[in-house]
């Protein structure tokens, strides 16, 4: 593969890049779907089984090109058994960061997610950088934040 220098016109910085997929580690696909689809209202984009695995993606209706892959922590086929064990332990301890969703109403979103029984990490609060946000844990222990610009 040819290597390009930073000043080369074919440099990535000159290209228009967009987020397509991001991954959230989960313990169980169905549990994760119950949260991301049923509580947060994300649409299921893919739910396909192949080679004994399951490929599940969800995303916001307003962002059809952005997909969140719900992937078991130990699913990476290139991971060693030790790596899989460590990933599973980090997930169980809530140490894997996840996602921040933008919302028009942080307080209303907070109330809806609370009513669904999600574990609250932070009630809505204003920050000096012009954002009001709140935080929860999803069923797998990932932090999920809801942010509203002020």
How would you describe each model-predicted region?
Residues 2-23, 43-137, 147-150:
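Vicinal oxygen chelate
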Residues 31-32, 108:
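Short Gly/charged-rich anion-binding patches and loops
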Residues 32-37, 113, 138-141:
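Conserved active-site tyrosine of GNAT-family acetyltransferases
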């Amino acid at each position: 593969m040819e290597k390009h220098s930073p000043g080369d016109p074919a440099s990535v910085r000159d290209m228009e890049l967009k987020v397509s997929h991001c991954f959230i580690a989960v313990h169980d696909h169905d549990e994760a779907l119950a949260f991301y689809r049923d509580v947060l209202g994300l649409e299921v984009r893919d739910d396909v089984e192949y080679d004994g695995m399951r490929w599940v993606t969800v995303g916001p209706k307003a962002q059809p090109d952005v997909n969140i892959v719900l992937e078991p922590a130990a699913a990476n086929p290139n991971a060693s058994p030790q790596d899989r064990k460590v990933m599973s332990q980090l997930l169980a301890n809530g140490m894997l960061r996840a996602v921040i969703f933008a919302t028009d109403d942080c307080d209303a979103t907070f109330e809806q997610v609370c009513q669904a029984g999600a574990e609250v990490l932070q009630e809505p609060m204003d920050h000096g950088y012009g954002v009001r946000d709140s935080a929860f844990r999803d069923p797998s222990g990932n932090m999920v934040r809801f942010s509203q610009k002020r």
